[in-house]
Amino acid sequence: DVKRKWAYYVLRGRGWREGFRAVEPLVVLENAAKSLDWMWKEYENGVIELAFDSTEQLLPKWRRYRGPKSHGADLTFGEFRHALAYCNSYTQEHRPEMLTALCGVLYRNAGNSKLGQWRESFNANLMQFYGNRIHKMPDYLKWGVYAWFSSFCRFLTEGTFIIDGHEVCFAPVFSRSKREDVFDQSLGLNSIVFSVAESGVFGSVKDTDDAPLLRVLMKLLDDHNKAEALRKEMKK
């Protein structure tokens, strides 16, 4: 059914309309749907997963709401913490309201252009408000947001970012088993925000939550590298 709906959406976007051809509409949809197997991965245990592996933002706007920039460039640490919590909850329980909440966190009003803000600043006290105003977003777009954020989370723990002209990999920051799925990892983000705040690098807990996600992770990576260097030095 999902393949048929997606095929219908794609065909409509290409100008196809029922009745344009002699072939029955359902036959056209069925044939198109069969050609979309490359979009999903099917596992032996029956699990079907969308094969999406990109951090490029393909839905920068929906109506007047703006989403994150490509590669999570403008995500704050606090915004990411809350988005990840909703993403994990939806992955485990498949509750529609959790998916809506995820989209509400990520898609907000335009920011102050004079300050160079793409989106308005994230406010954790407005979580319910964010969800209420984004609830009319079509389900297929919500799934797209979920797919993008899921892919970003995987890339965050495995991929390489280019920051200030340097390649940076945050994999050492995340302790994970090879058997664990990215969503089952114990990232400990709630404890991280307090430990980073104690260092005073970004300021208070709120300041740390408002700091860019990638900058906070760079701080954690630096701490990890220093700890590893000290551990090796002590073994000599």
Q: What are the language-model segments listed below?
A:
Residues 1-236:
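An amphipathic, hydrophobic-aromatic interaction surface with interspersed Lys/Arg
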